[in-house]
Amino acid sequence: MTNSPPRSLITRLGIPPTLAWGYLGLLLFMIGDGVESGYLSPYLIDRGVSESRVALLFTVYGIAAGLAAWLSGVLSDLWGPRRVMWTGLAIWAVFQLLFLTAAIPLAGYPLMMISYGLRGLGYPLFAYGFLVWIAGVAPRARLGTAMGWFWFAFTGGLPTLGSLVASGLIPRIGSYATLWAALALVAAGGLIALLLVRDDHGGRRPRGAGDGPLATLVGSVTVLWRNPRVGVGSLVRVINTASQFGFFVIMPIHFTRTVGFSLTQWLHLLSAMFATNIFANLLFGVVGDRLGWRRTIAWFGGAGCTVSTLLLFYVPHVAGPNFPLALLVAAFYGATLAGYVPLSALVPTLEPKHQGQALAALNLGAGASTFVGPAVVAVFVGPLGVEGVIWIFAGMYAVSFLLAHFLQLPDEAGTARAAADPGTATAAASAPA
């Protein structure tokens, strides 16, 4: 039924055979999306856009991405995931073309806001549409593994391999041409996923009574106060990656202009940071099952990120452009971001009768982090500087450490009984940290 690579190995790896090409397409798409993540900010500043305007541009992009992340599941129910993915690919390609052919050459900031901001709708529709597709196709017994491979491809591309591609292309073809290469990668990945995946029964996610599109959309907001623990979990998810998206704005500038690293060195640090994160995602999933989800989130996520965020600033600040030391703290920061992985299982378990709404609320938190981080930078980097922004992010992580203690489950072990309940299988479909 599908045009896919050999199935035996794929099946053993836990990848649904009919969707195998989709994983490859997702990886290429996210590599293309991640190419700019380590250098677009300094590139625009070099072209005369102020630092605060760049931060605002990234904030608008994040708002669009957050909206698309929230809507992707509902639209997949209405249209089917394939159509949602086509929509995401088309949005990304059209507005990237506008950004490259008009906004950048004309140095028009309003046009940048329109083209780059609306392009932010693209990748969540494509990626999370595919995530819903996986949830509808993968056998329940292997759903967690299938979702693990999804996040491996997602974070492997954005920003890990994307930054490596940029570090290799920029010295050879320049920064502007590298943005065109990103478009080519996104187009190639999108077409591979959408043309080579020929699955006939994964178009729509099954819905239970009361879980229609409108009910899920409205309920994903009202559940935040109907069940305050879900609201707390969503807030913790916002904090989880807020610093990551804020650092995309200020850290390339800080590490290259203040600390003294070259742009290539910074891109290598960024790649190492999120390469560590990829494997730490798998590790903390296991740790959460052993230690308990809430404790893992609080100590490895909240407390860990509080420390690693400060180290990421102060170690290079004191040691200067010492690449091995910077590599260590960058890897430590990337690993601690993954300490929030058990949120994926915990939050839907807090609302067992409306897991779809809890998942949408968690995705809302994930999407919100993409603009909260740049917004913190835009508001505070002027009056407080980079150091002040770092302390704000560290303080947010300390707050998440405290909030995590309110995410109490009836079964604090949170593993054996939850794993035995078939209803919790859908928890794997939520966005990991």
What are these model-predicted stretches?
Residues 62-70, 159-160, 274-278, 282, ...:
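Residue-level signature of mid-helix packing/kink "hotspots" within the transmembrane helices
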Residues 2-16, 199-234, 433:
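Juxtamembrane intracellular "pre-TM" segments in multi-pass secondary transporters
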